[in-house]
Amino acid sequence: MATKKWLLLMVVTVMVAPLLTACGAEPTPTPEPAVAQPTQVPEPEPTAAPEPVTIEWWTVSSEEYTEEVQRAMAQEFEASHPNIKVNVTVLPSSGFGEKMTTALGAGEGAPDVAFFWDNNWFPEALELTPYIEADPDFSPDLYFPGFWNTRAMWGDKVVGLPLGVGANFVMYNKDVFDEAGVAYPTDDWTTEDYIDIATQLTDPEQKRWGGDRPRGPFRAIFFNYGARPYADDSSTVEGYLNSEETLAAYTWLWDLVDSGSTPTPAELEVLGTEGTGPVDLFLSGRLGMATLNQGHMLNAKEANASFGIVPEPGVEGQTRYMHGWSLTCSIWKGTEHPQEAWEFLSYWVGPEGQKYLMDNGNLFPSIPSVLDTYADADKDYVQAFFRVLAQDQDAEWLMGHPCYRGGVQRAIQDLWDKIMFGDIAREDIPAEMESLMGPAQDALEECVPRLGG
């Protein structure tokens, strides 16, 4: 038994000894130097994009730019300006003025951007000169000078940008002219030519008139005579309202009415109750010539009418004028976001916005370089319209002299009415004018302190 225990011990010793020897034979290894690990820079937390600024835009829907087209244009703007959201409010035209007047008068609740088509609102518009000077992509030179001067400028301030253009001109029905064997009018025709042509076209048996009458005194035709209601410095009507030029313009109007070649106010009123206005008479061939605008031009094109366009008739030796208009678009001076409002205004009324409204609506832009891209720009009637737009504007004087419409016009209305209704003899026109000089001067003196000269 003892022998077995001894043998077992010997076996264990033999097996363990080499292991102990092996372990003890290796030298202690030299530790490897630690390799420095790169510093881990924590990833920055993503910065949240700032919330877009919302600006309020008040507008109206029209034949030139529908609500749908304007909302789509605003979306185009937002897509390229993700920092700005436009809240579009489309108001009825009939209520726009009252709502704007109330908001501007209260000094709160007015839109950031809107039409400022009432000159009485101009004091509440933001002066745009600093924004124009800071914008390398914008220049007043983009626009027709006449429309910039009359719809962007207020005194020496820039209070808005002019959107679109419109003008009166004479449209003539080629079918009526051809039937009567009368030559078409040309751009250099005169006021006397107008009466002569209208008389030749008139045919009572067909209930057809040759032409129509001006819409009021001291517009394009009166300016073509060299007539002005009062002095440039707004000091007096003497020598202006009773000048030879003014009396010649009123006398021409009397001759036109007396020719019987135009519908009377009573006839137009009856036709109006039947839903027949001047453009309807023109398209139906009952009016050989009519003083219309670019909207009527598009209506005539859509109706496939055969027509031409010439400026309103002029006077030999005098500068020729046209009666044009544009709409002032402005920023409210109380806006909390003037820079964002400028970015939208300069888009809406700049090349991008006006081209969008032209291509998708019926707007004729106030920017010549954009207007030149109009789809039918090469058509004769469009080229004729463009030539009208290039003329001097009566509005340049009228806009700078607000007291004509602000008082003087009402004071002299009787003479216009008497001529239109055939209630005055030709030779009595000078005396009638002299009788109105006192009331006109009083109206001018009352108005100048109120509206300026």
Locations of the language-model features?
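Short helix-initiation/N-cap motifs at beta->coil->alpha
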Residues: 90-99, 189-195, 266-280, 325
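Glycine-centered hinge/linker elements that transmit conformational signals in sensory
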Residues: 198, 235-271, 301-303, 312
